[in-house]
Amino acid sequence: MSDKQSFTREEYLADVRGANGTRAQWFALMLEEAEKAGIDLDKFCEDTIYEFGLGRCKKYGVCEGNPGKMAEMLYGSNGQDVFEMELAEKTDERGVLKFHFCPLAHTWKAMGLPAERVAELCRLACYSDFARADCAGVNLHFENQIGRGDEICELVFTPRKDGDPSGAEACRVDCAQKDGE
């Protein structure tokens, strides 16, 4: 007799989204305590979340600095269904992914956190995404983010040019540009 279990697609998605939600909860609580201790959250997340992203991106070199390849690779990942991804554009000059669901933002909102805190947690969690873009040799900009109150997350990948900021720098700049609108 086999101990192997089978799950429906819906059960699998619920479990994976639940795991992402648990991660979102401890991330929020951890940063709350770090803030109480006087730790600079950007520096802390750059040193941890950005490093986490770098550790996960070994396969991203196959993108060869091509934004469309980066978008396509992420679209083909296990996260496609979890984040309800849409591959909106795939060219050598631009790759665009749209996420129609974010289990992290969903959890932070369900925790009753204020909109400003959800937006800040979202931005800090994105250090990982910017690290992955660095590994792929492309730039990343978030045109929209569910955590900022937008309907979707829209990740826009463009070619990296000499003098472009690192992903960590881009994470801070991306937020400042959105806040300045």
Locate the predicted segments by residue.
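N-terminal accessory segment detector
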Residues: 1-123, 128, 139-153, 158-181
